[in-house]
Design a protein with these regions (language model features):
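Metal-dependent phosphodiesterase/nuclease catalytic metal-binding core
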Residues: 32, 47-87, 107-109, 205-516, ...
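A glycine-rich helix N-cap at a beta->alpha junction
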Residues: 189-200, 633-634
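Residues that form ligand- and interface-recognition hot spots within folded domains
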Residues: 96, 110-112, 121, 131, ...
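N-terminal mitochondrial targeting presequence
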Residues: 1-47
């Protein structure tokens, strides 16, 4: 607790104590309790609002993280023994297989340590779904500073901080220091976690292995622009120039901005990692030892085992016993290598690197068990790279991560979509996969194509393991739903009603505008709901994206499949409501992939109109200057310039606004500040044909938003929390279900779609009594048009039936909470967690525990991200 908290709480205690003493008779003191409680809550609120980066959820103590402390003690005990005894179990596991929607990332496990190699967008979501614990990570290795490798790193760091991880070290290119400084522009100070960058020249050693970092420099053609490893090209030097410095970039030094940026964001460096496990002493064979008469099971055996495992012969009762007679051989420690060769321009540098060559020509001890290639197919096809792979010993296995994979990563998302699809196939379309059209390279070495959760075990037995690879069986998912009591009956009713509605609306169907929900959850990506992103397809050729949280591009891939490039090319405008990470950290990947899509389809490059808080330019400027080019992708329009009555002084901004309206056939695009964090905005836009859409972003109920959304055809409003949690909603500056519906009624909106649900409502939110035939709830990958407004409320009975078990568990939690805190006091969070721990006898109890853990991290993220 910081100094401000202590002073305020101490003052509150003295004030309340003094009033209690002066209250006189006990009856009066009891009557005064309401005053005490009010005063205490007032000062506590002031204290928690003083520093938005360090405040904790009310009723929750800051996590002390027993697990990391236990690990520290274990390490101390190992060091006291003075025994560098390698771990018994080590394996490497694929997280992201390198597909277009899930960039290459690897998780390395030992009983002593956990490591992550690369952290693209969606990595955290996959780890959460597949139960790979981020809380145990203490080292993250990055092969290259590209958004494909670091897109999920800011979110991962925030999660590590929120879960109480004390320290995390990043290894890789030196620009990582600049990256960490850049993300602080929106994450705020990261004081609760110690972050450091290990220079790429340093060797790293811990209880599991020694990691040798191998810097590899390529000679890039032309300028050092944005590198596209998947398509094997550098963005053309004739790309439009960066926006003028007086609008979006401040150059505080006298040197040439172009030269300085080029030097600072050097893209010619990749870092390979040579990882050698520590030797592991052989195992003592008890049965054989007994045959030799050794005193197994007595105190005398300890020193004998130690000597034998150290490779020394012993003499016992006149008999010489050799180590190999009673111990398995010592494991010298296998080697694995991770190398990224992102384009053909790196092939020469990789293939001639002397540090890597040693492992092609060295002795048995240096023979790598595995080489991991994060390498596009265009590189694998080159003769030089093929020959380089063939120079490794024939016993070396090769693991390849690139777009030439056909694995499904997000199983839970596919499962729920398949089940929803049975209710309404058009509103809940089946998910798709992007498949590259590039032929697969013919390789003459033992190689395996990556799949999500594929393992290569290094110890105790060296082997491939496929038992953890998830299965995506749509038929099984649908069968599971069909076995839910009364579900099929409700689906039949729903379809009959929808058919009747469709017949009545025959000839009135209107395909556009079409709204596609890409992310409907809050705070952090989870296995079922991704974070904020809503695509509005205004016409067959133009789209607007409302918020762009981490993983939005991956969601687009899974929604559109092979047509994702067409969808990307149509996006002309992106609106960012505010600078919390769950609303904007998917922007860069979207911009880079959109440029790739335009090139692939042979279309002229065009910039996106970015309507966002002005503070986003601090982040984009720093990333552009020190990491990769990005400013040449945008025409920036500050949110405040679209507020009612705003004076726009810059002619450039005025021209951008007019171009945005013309491009999207809009009559008006308005914004207003809302009641959330600093510089949070909502928006509304009116089409030339007369329809109007209003989007709340994150906010408490807000009169200004009601004004700009008057008579909206569609209102998309956040409903983060259920009714009964109004105090928590105020604390986190969000809306409850009924509050969101009330805003729509005051707005006189034709239809209200609720959105941005707390991740505790993973599958479905709790319904309020205010639900009516003008209200619907959003799901990831849900696709609606205005003609669906009559249908959407008719889906609710089938949805309630499908998720009846989840709704029942949420209602039980609510009842327990209300029993303990009838007025919905702010300490409900802690009480709910204790309750879920106590109810540890059912399947529902386990879900409660998971919900409570998610709630804890989400609570911190909602308040500090």
């Amino acid at each position: 607790m910081n100094t401000v908290h202590l002073k305020l709480l101490s003052f509150t205690f003295l004030l309340v104590k003094g009033r209690a003493r002066s209250a006189g008779p006990p009856a009066v003191a009891r009557c005064d309790f309401r005053f005490h409680r009010t005063v205490f809550q007032f000062f506590r609120t002031m204290a928690t609002n003083t520093n938005t980066e360090t405040r904790q959820p009310l009723g929750l103590k800051k996590a002390k993280q027993k697990e990391p402390l236990r690990r520290v003690k274990t390490k101390e005990n190992r060091s006291k023994r003075g025994d560098v005894h390698g771990p018994s179990t080590v394996y490497l596991q694929v997280v992201g297989a390198g597909s277009r929607d899930n960039a290459a990332s690897l998780y390395v496990f030992s009983e002593y340590n956990r490591y992550l190699f690369n952290c693209g967008e969606g990595t955290q979501r996959l780890m959460q779904e597949h139960k790979l614990k981020a809380a145990r990570l203490d080292n993250i290795f990055l092969t290259r500073l590209s958004w494909e490798n670091v897109g999920g790193l800011s979110g991962m760091i925030l999660t590590l901080k929120d879960t109480g991880v004390p320290e995390c070290v990043l290894s890789g290119p030196p620009q990582l220091e600049n990256y960490l400084n850049a993300i602080k522009s929106f994450s705020g100070p990261l004081e609760d976690i110690k972050l450091s960058v290990r220079p790429y020249t340093e060797t790293y050693k811990d209880d599991t292995m020694t990691v040798y970092q191998v810097p590899i420099f390529a000679q890039l053609r032309g300028d050092s622009g944005k590198l596209f490893p998947k398509s094997g090209r550098i963005s053309p030097s004739q790309s439009p120039a960066s926006p003028r410095t007086d609008d979006v970039h401040i150059n505080s030094r006298g040197d040439s901005p172009g030269e300085r940026r080029k030097a600072a964001r050097d893209t010619s460096l990749v870092v390979a990692f040579i990882c050698k496990l520590h030797p592991k002493k052989g195992n003592f064979l008890v049965a054989q030892a007994k045959e030799f008469g050794l005193p197994v099971g007595t105190a005398a055996i300890g020193p004998l085992i130690a000597a034998l495992k150290d490779g020394k012969s012993i003499t016992y009762e006149g008999k010489e016993i050799l180590p190999e007679q009673v111990c398995t051989p010592t494991d010298p420690g296998p080697v694995f290598i991770i190398v990224e060769c992102p384009s053909e321009e790196f092939v020469e540098a990789v293939c001639t690197n002397q540090q890597l060559r040693r492992y092609q020509t060295g002795g048995t001890e240096d023979c790598p068990a595995l080489v991991v290639h994060m390498t596009p197919e265009s590189v694998l096809k080159t003769d030089q790279y093929k020959k380089w792979m063939e120079r490794f010993p024939p016993t070396t296995e090769h693991l390849i991560l690139n777009e030439h994979v056909c694995t499904v990563h997000n199983i839970r998302s596919h499962k729920i979509q398949a089940q929803l699809n049975t209710i309404h196939p058009e509103i809940f379309p089946e998910l798709k996969s992007y498949k590259t059209k590039e032929p697969q390279a013919a390789l003459h070495v033992p190689n395996v194509r990556a799949e999500c959760l594929l393992k290569f075990q290094l110890r105790p037995v060296m082997e491939w393991q496929r038992d953890a690879i998830p299965s995506c069986n749509t038929e099984e998912f649908v069968k599971e739903a069909s076995e839910v009591s009364n579900f099929l009956e409700e689906v039949d009713k729903c379809r009959k009603i929808c058919s009747t509605d469709a017949a009545e609306l025959s000839g009135q169907e209107q395909k556009y505008p079409e709204v596609v929900f890409m992310g409907t959850g809050s705070a952090l990506p989870m296995k079922i709901r991704n974070v904020s992103g809503t695509l509005v397809n205004i016409s067959p050729s133009q789209s607007v994206l409302l918020d762009c949280g981490e993983g939005t591009f991956g969601q687009l891939c899974r929604h559109y499949g092979d047509s994702v490039d067409d969808a990307l090319c149509k996006i002309s405008t992106v609106f960012i409501s505010h600078m919390h990470a769950d609303h904007h950290t998917g922007l860069l990947m979207l911009l880079y992939q959109r440029e790739r899509a335009l090139t692939t389809l042979g279309k002229a490059f065009s910039r996106i109109y970015l309507v966002a808080p002005v503070h986003i330019m601090t982040w984009l400027n720093q990333y552009h200057e020190y990491c990769e080019e990005i400013l040449n992708h945008i025409n920036f329009i500050p949110n405040k310039s679209l507020c009612d009555g705003a004076e726009v002084s810059k002619q450039r901004t005025k021209s951008f606004i007019q171009a945005l309206l013309k491009k999207n056939d809009l009559e008006k695009f308005q914004t207003c500040t809302v009641r959330h964090c600093m510089n949070a905005f909502a928006c509304s836009f009116t089409h030339q044909s007369g329809w109007k859409l209003a989007f709340s972003g994150d906010t408490m109920p807000c009169d200004a938003f009601v004004d700009i959304g008057k008579s909206a055809t569609l209102l998309i409003h956040e409903a983060t929390l259920e009714d009964g949690l109004e105090e928590e909603a105020v604390e986190k500056r969000h809306s409850t279900t009924s509050q969101a519906i009330d805003i729509g009624m005051r707005m006189n909106a034709e239809f209200i779609m609720l959105n941005h649900f707390s991740q505790r409502y993973a599958k479905i939110p709790l319904f309020s009594e205010d639900f009516n035939d003008r209200v619907g709830i959003s799901f990831d990958h849900m696709r609606i048009c205005f003609g669906d407004f009559k249908i959407l409320p008719r889906l609710i009975p089938a949805l309630k039936t499908l998720f009846a078990e989840d709704i029942g568990e949420m209602e039980e939690r609510r009842e327990r909470r209300e029993l303990r805190h009838p007025r919905g006091s702010s300490s409900e969070v802690n009480s709910e967690q204790k309750t879920t721990r106590a109810a540890n006898v059912s399947r529902g109890a386990k879900r409660d525990q998971e919900a409570a853990a998610t709630h804890s991290v989400e609570t911190k993220r909602l308040k500090t991200s």
